[in-house]
Amino acid sequence: MISRLLQNNLMSVDPVSSQAMELSDVTLIEGVGNEVMVVAGVVALTLALVLAWLSTYVADSGNNQLLGTIVSAGDTSVLHLGHVDQLVNQGTPEPTEHPHPSGGNDDKAEETSDSGGDATGEPGARGEMEPSLEHLLDIQGLPKRQAGLGSSRPEAPLGLDDGSCLSPSPSLINVRLKFLNDTEELAVARPEDTVGTLKSKYFPGQESQMKLIYQGRLLQDPARTLSSLNITNNCVIHCHRSPPGAAVSGPSASLTPTTEQSSLGVNVGSLMVPVFVVLLGVVWYFRINYRQFFTGPATISLVGVTVFFSILVFGMYGR
């Protein structure tokens, strides 16, 4: 009996213990233990703290970049820079050292002579240093000196920057031929050359296909000279190459496409109003004969559209 009771108790306890074991085996990431996750979290936190501390580190700026010194009483305060001090030191001769003779009296005499020499030499040295410092630190006079240097340089004559714009001789002019793809070609011609000569010289065999446009005018007359068209040196002439079968001479060729487009636009515009009138008439016919299919809002909308269209038509054709 006792053994059976123990077996029953063990069987009743086994599910609870199995659930506890399952809960203890649960991890945050499958295949990785909780201890590893804790260690990784501690390492990540440590790295974040180290990076935060490094981000607040500021390097000490050198004290040798800008030094300000105050001159003793009686002298003007001057801001000394490193390179200014070097220039001043180069300009002033270094004092030579004199050997000190032995003896107290000689030392006293030398001290008095040195003090007297320094007293007389300091004003001269300051007088030599102050003009050089004032010249170097004169910020307001810097633009004037630069302007003086710029004016002393000889100015290059106009037209020398670009060698292509210069004409080879006084009797020749440079003409820039610009195409639709923004490419340019430099043509050298004489003022008495004609448009036909320019075409045959630079577009041989394509004279009938090339169209030259200058200041919005189409150069159609091949017998006109460049001087008569006010084409001077470095002028720009726009060039257009038409397809071989589309070259039609005369002003009628240029007017035909525009007239066709305008007539097409007039026809479409004139047809819009009759078509809309017919549509409104059909809708009103169905409204009168089949009024059971039209609700109140639909009827009100139809009346509003009709009134708006009538006002628009009277406004267009009543002028």
Curated annotation (Swiss-Prot):
<dbReference type="GO" id="GO:0016020">
    <property type="term" value="C:membrane"/>
</dbReference>
<dbReference type="InterPro" id="IPR040352">
    <property type="entry name" value="TMUB1/2"/>
</dbReference>
<feature type="transmembrane region" description="Helical">
    <location>
        <begin position="298"/>
        <end position="318"/>
    </location>
</feature>
<protein>
    <recommendedName>
        <fullName>Transmembrane and ubiquitin-like domain-containing protein 2</fullName>
    </recommendedName>
</protein>
<feature type="region of interest" description="Disordered">
    <location>
        <begin position="88"/>
        <end position="128"/>
    </location>
</feature>
<feature type="transmembrane region" description="Helical">
    <location>
        <begin position="264"/>
        <end position="284"/>
    </location>
</feature>
<keyword id="KW-0812">Transmembrane</keyword>
<keyword id="KW-1133">Transmembrane helix</keyword>
<feature type="domain" description="Ubiquitin-like">
    <location>
        <begin position="173"/>
        <end position="246"/>
    </location>
</feature>
<dbReference type="InterPro" id="IPR029071">
    <property type="entry name" value="Ubiquitin-like_domsf"/>
</dbReference>
<dbReference type="GO" id="GO:0036503">
    <property type="term" value="P:ERAD pathway"/>
</dbReference>
<feature type="compositionally biased region" description="Basic and acidic residues">
    <location>
        <begin position="95"/>
        <end position="111"/>
    </location>
</feature>
<feature type="transmembrane region" description="Helical">
    <location>
        <begin position="36"/>
        <end position="56"/>
    </location>
</feature>
<dbReference type="InterPro" id="IPR000626">
    <property type="entry name" value="Ubiquitin-like_dom"/>
</dbReference>
<keyword id="KW-0472">Membrane</keyword>
<feature type="region of interest" description="Disordered">
    <location>
        <begin position="145"/>
        <end position="165"/>
    </location>
</feature>
<dbReference type="Pfam" id="PF00240">
    <property type="entry name" value="ubiquitin"/>
</dbReference>
